[in-house]
From Swiss-Prot:
Protein name in UniProt: Large ribosomal subunit protein bL36c
Record organism: Aneura mirabilis (Parasitic liverwort)
InterPro entries, A to Z: Ribosomal_bL36 (IPR000473), Ribosomal_bL36_sp (IPR035977)
SUPFAM superfamilies reported in the protein's UniProt record: Ribosomal protein L36
Keywords, comma-separated and alphabetical: Plastid, Ribonucleoprotein, Ribosomal protein
Length: 37
């Protein structure tokens, strides 16, 4: 899980979601997991 100021999709499998007022990226590739902080 990477904590970043700006999250973006890395590949076509990445999906932007909102959880508890936080923008997150979930993907089938675990390296692409990101959280905005």
């Amino acid at each position: 899980m990477k904590i970043r100021a700006s999250v973006r999709k890395i590949c076509e499998n990445c999906r932007l979601i909102r959880r508890r007022k936080r923008v997150m990226v979930v993907c089938s590739n675990p390296k692409h997991k990101q959280k905005q902080g």
